[in-house]
Regions:
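Flexible loop and strand-edge segments within Gram-negative outer membrane beta-barrel domains
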Residues: 33-73, 77-80, 91-182, 195-197, ...
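Outer-membrane beta-barrel architecture
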Residues: 67, 113, 199-201, 216-222
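Transmembrane beta-barrel domains of bacterial outer-membrane proteins
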Residues: 83, 108, 220-222
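Membrane-embedded beta-strand positions of outer-membrane beta-barrel proteins
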Residues: 70, 116, 206, 221-223
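Conserved small-residue
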Residues: 1-31, 130-137
Length: 250
């Protein structure tokens, strides 16, 4: 289709040759499979589903004098993006939340109840930092050419194309498109920049309920003291860009 578009624009000098088209269809070597890539970025960068976990545990009981209730919960929301945690960077998208709630009611007298309520949650959000923000990953996946570059250079490439400058770096290498690194979705995911955000909330109440049936049946008075706190802060952040490489096939 690209050739058809170029012919319509009379750009005959820039047509892709039949030999090159055959290499895209059936690469003649594993090195040519990198030189003539056919990458489905959506399949390579995303899973077909995202994980979600919810767990909760409750306990309650009491006596004539005291009643109690306690609840703890955990929630996890994953992502369809294929991230990685290799001990150096964590490019996964996820959100974990831990929450708790406790209620204790004391029957101080037949007409007086003092209640203590405490609850809160802690949330941890982890995500990579593509150059164009949170929406940038979709931009790279749907905007990158399938035939411009592979996802990365496997370590075996050094067997066929030795690196005279860094011969000791025998590992998979991120790809730079001729010194321009904004086009490769895999590079954006794995470049090394990620951030972890933590938010915490705490709620506490002390409630006094006094029945006043001696004045009027059903009459009562209630007093309440509440305290709420909220914190949001960056737990971990990296600003290091992992090196990217460009392989000259000429």
């Amino acid at each position: 289709l690209m050739n058809v578009a170029k012919m319509n624009d009379q750009l005959f000098d820039s047509l892709t040759s039949e030999a090159d088209l055959n290499e895209y269809r059936r690469p003649s070597s594993r090195l040519n499979a990198l030189r003539y890539p056919d990458v489905n970025w959506l399949d390579e960068m995303t899973d077909s589903f995202a994980s979600t976990i919810n767990a909760n545990f409750n306990i309650q009981g009491g006596t004539r004098f005291v009643k109690y209730f306690a609840s703890v919960g955990y929630a996890h929301e994953g992502s369809i993006f294929k991230g990685v945690n290799d001990g150096k960077i964590d490019s996964r998208y996820y959100y974990n939340r831990f929450n708790f709630r406790t209620n204790v009611d004391f029957n101080v007298t037949p007409t007086t109840v003092v209640s203590f309520k405490l609850g809160g949650n802690v949330g941890i959000k982890n995500k990579p930092q593509p150059q164009d923000g949170d929406d940038g990953m979709w931009k790279y996946i749907f905007g990158s050419s399938t035939a411009k570059y592979p996802m990365y250079y496997p370590s075996w490439v050094l067997e066929e194309v030795p690196d005279l400058d860094y011969p000791g770096v025998v590992e998979d290498r991120l790809i730079s498109e001729a010194d321009q690194t904004t086009g490769n979705p895999y590079y954006q995911m794995m470049r090394g920049r990620f951030i972890q955000l933590t938010d915490s909330k705490l709620f506490s109440d002390i409630i006094l309920n006094q029945k006043l049936d001696f004045i009027t049946k059903g009459l009562s008075v209630q007093g309440k003291v509440s305290l709420s706190t909220y914190y949001k802060y960056t737990t971990l952040r990296t600003e290091y860009d992992r090196p990217a490489w460009y392989l000259d096939f000429s």
